[in-house]
Structures are given as structure tokens and as C-alpha cells.
Regions:
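Acidic, Ser/Thr- and proline-rich intrinsically disordered linker/docking segments
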Residues: 2-14, 19-84, 89-141
Length: 141
């Protein structure tokens, strides 16, 4: 079932199926960014200038992180002082670097690489490793 939301951004109105959005990013200044499905266009919502749409996004993020949704594996990952909420089932490739153990993956509807380090971000790293093992059957070593 689709989860359609109307968002106002830069004097335009977008109607977006949030079930097709693969990642959201909370920034330290309170802004929330997501990328339109099937393209790399970021939508950045500021709570000071667009409180109504900001609340819609927060409500959806709360819903997806609390519910056990079929065909999704939503996780919170802290990366470069931002909190990303990512559906790992939408990620189609992972790159593992044996010397230091880092894992890199790219957000499907964005161009941003996410690099997870086992030393500096052990909780997020473990979530990604577990997902890779469960989904692909491959073990990183």
C-alpha cells in the first residue's frame, strides 16, 4: 500500500510515495533531507520554515522505524555527524575493505556514499554486517 504525501519545497508542490524513498537524513541543525525516488534530487525540509511538512516526515520516520514492515529493513546509522534512516533492502552493493574493515555503500536515490567504520561506529557497522549476512549469505572477513 502506497504512502503518498504532499510536500511543499522551493515554491513547488511534490506528491511523493514515501514507500519508495530509501533514506532520510537528520542534520544537526534540525533539517531533514530525503531524495526523490528514481532520481538524485534532494528535498531539504527545514522545521522553522516548513513545520507542517517537517512533521509529516517525522511521523513517517517514526512509523517505519517502529513497525516491522514487509520488504524493508530500516536502520538508523550515524555518519558524519548526521543520523541517516536507511532501508538497507534498497542497497544493491556493498564494498568491504579488508585492511581496515570499512564498509561502503551508496544511497540508491542519491549520490552519497556511506562509509561505516567498525572502530568509530560499531553499532551501525554491526547492523550493516548482519544485514549483508542475512540477505546475501556472504560473510565479510
Amino acid at each position: 500500500m502506497a504512502y503518498w504525501v504532499k510536500i511543499s519545497y522551493e515554491r513547488k508542490e511534490y506528491v511523493v510515495n514515501f514507500e519508495r524513498v530509501s533514506a532520510f537524513c537528520y542534520e544537526q541543525n534540525g533539517r531533514v533531507t530525503f531524495w526523490l525516488p528514481d532520481c538524485a534530487i534532494p528535498i531539504v525540509i527545514n522545521p522553522q520554515s516548513n513545520q507542517q511538512d517537517y512533521q509529516k516526515i517525522l511521523k513517517y520516520i517514526q512509523y517505519i522505524t517502529e513497525a516491522q514492515l514487509e520488504n524493508s529493513y530500516w536502520v538508523k546509522i550515524y555518519y558524519e555527524r548526521n543520523e541517516y534512516v536507511i532501508n538497507l533492502n534498497c542497497i544493491s552493493s556493498f564494498c568491504y575493505e579488508p585492511p581496515n574493515g570499512r564498509i561502503t555503500f551508496w544511497l540508491p536515490d542519491g549520490i552519497i556514499p556511506i562509509i561505516i567504520n567498525p572502530v568509530s561506529n560499531p553499532e551501525s557497522y554491526e547492523k550493516v554486517v548482519n544485514h549483508i549476512q542475512k540477505t546475501t549469505g556472504h560473510f565479510l572477513s
